[in-house]
């Protein structure tokens, strides 16, 4: 009888334990959702994975894991496994934010297509994007189908560009510059003796500076205390002397451009630029031109052509303020987003990132030549492998565009993203080759010259 009573008690306890386990799991889920909504994917990912390990393995959780992995450099190839599982159970009436939801939304199919594209599986990406369009069916008004079609075209463009790669040489700036985290937004002074960049550390985003001596970069100095940042300031450009820095400040509801000056070997507390640069909307990037008489910046203010547009403002020396900005026009700006403009040393070429021009996927880097006052040539895709099937957002040109600095993930790198210097070889910048010994110039004359 005692044994029978013990068994009944054990069964009752097990029934009570299950609702408690589910309640605990729901709390983990809500925490993960919170981090994901604030785009803190590295915080959200282990929580979603915990749910899988605890037995809550369903299409919904697999979808969220795949989504997170697609946003973390170095882990994007792992997203395919989870998104493939997610699309096996699509729920067209998907309940966003519900732990009880076991299915995945139709949008999971789009994410699978994106995962194939990012991982250069272009045939599978095209097939999956078409499947997504079929799944959407008559509900096209609920989805941005223009963007889906643009992704399809970008896969086709990627095929073309990957068949004809440009000639480059890539130099990783090394472990002294690159931390184990994401090292991004590299900007340099004209002679490349000073670099400033942002590193996304574990607890905050920090701005660093390094000086080059004897052709070697020194230990980076954390500028965050000098510029009095709470992790919300990000460098965007340097002037040619490297003693004035523009920064982007991320506020809860908008972004603003600030400026800091180097005085007595220290950077001043940044001050906000005037109302002609900063609006109540998002200003996300700004750069100086060579003579520092103009600032090119991005903004999604009213009256633009697309999302973020590129504008230019000229300094009014009489009134000592930046003048009213001019939109660079439809030759540069598209109905999508343009970002991170930089001007070449001679002031004749603009480099920028765009979602709207003919690219390989997401943002690509383009350049256009100045052909008149606020007039530009048709933008040219800088080419593969500088551009990839992923987002490529930041290219700081040096040597009039024959080289540049950018951040990217590399399998043999030091961090999630490393800062690299890329030399671009062309007719205007031919690759030089050093040889030792002798080479034969003419088979008939048998003339030999010493190698160099």
What function would you assign to each model-found segment?
Residues 38, 72-73, 119:
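Structural motif corresponding to the intra-repeat A-B loop/turn of tetratricopeptide repeats
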Residues 41, 75-76, 122:
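TPR-repeat structural position
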